[in-house]
Design a protein with these regions (language model features):
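Flavin-dependent oxidoreductase catalytic core characteristic
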Residues: 1-227
Length: 227
């Protein structure tokens, strides 16, 4: 949808015309926008269903959330000695995103209890964190399988795609987590949790500009997205 909107802008007034190449893409993009209403409902239901199962004892979220809170009181693990290949940083990021979600969701449940279901903004923040986790973990695991099959060199561009996505996802998780925490916590409690969130959304620097240029060049050469 973003690419379509940018394409329409590039062609200016002609962007909506059948004489320009963007008209079909713009019509197709309308389908996604119709789905957006349903997606908004599903975002709310994602967290709602998760919390209902936790409250009924079907899944144990609070124990994991309490473990994360306990970890915050310990000395940070800087990952010394960890080596999981080219995706070491990304695999660690996925694990930390899970902890960030548990930190925010656990604190929200403890603080708001049954009132949480009425706090749609907080539910949306947590849902967006979960969505980014799902996409991040899925992309990393899928890339791992490809690397095991064809090797790192053959999967170089896919590696850059995943690293770029993870970099963006971690930033979004940090922002959503921060907005959620600031909605129900304050004072020293808020400062402590924000420090914890920062700890779990820390990522080694990666040059996303060069990666995006390499990705764009490949797409331009192939005249399509062939990954």
């Amino acid at each position: 949808d973003y690419v379509t909107d940018e394409g329409v802008q590039i062609y200016g007034g002609m962007g909506f015309s059948a004489d320009a190449p963007m008209d079909r893409s713009y019509r197709d993009a309308r389908i996604n926008r119709i789905f957006e209403g349903t997606n908004e409902i599903n975002r709310l239901l994602t967290v709602d269903q998760l919390l209902k199962r936790a409250m009924s004892g079907k899944i144990d979220i609070m124990s994991a959330a309490m473990a994360v809170q306990k970890e915050l009181m310990s000395v940070p693990d800087f990952g010394a000695g960890e080596d999981e290949g080219v995706l070491t940083n990304e695999l660690k990021a996925v694990r930390n995103i899970k902890k960030a979600i548990l930190l925010v969701a656990g604190a929200a449940v403890q603080k708001l209890m049954n009132k949480l279901k009425h706090e749609q903004e907080i539910l949306m923040n947590i849902a967006d964190m979960i969505i980014d986790l799902y996409a991040a973990e899925s992309s990393v695991l899928r890339l791992q399988k490809k690397i095991d099959t064809v090797g790192e060199e053959a999967a170089d561009l896919e590696i850059q795609i995943v690293k770029t996505f993870i970099s963006d996802a971690v930033e979004r998780v940090n922002i959503n987590g921060k907005h959620a925490l600031q909605s129900f916590a304050e004072g020293d409690e808020l400062r402590m949790m924000l420090m914890g969130l920062k700890r779990y959304t820390k990522l080694d620097p990666f040059n996303t500009k060069n990666a995006r240029r390499a990705i764009a060049t490949k797409i331009s050469e192939d005249q399509g997205y062939k990954f």
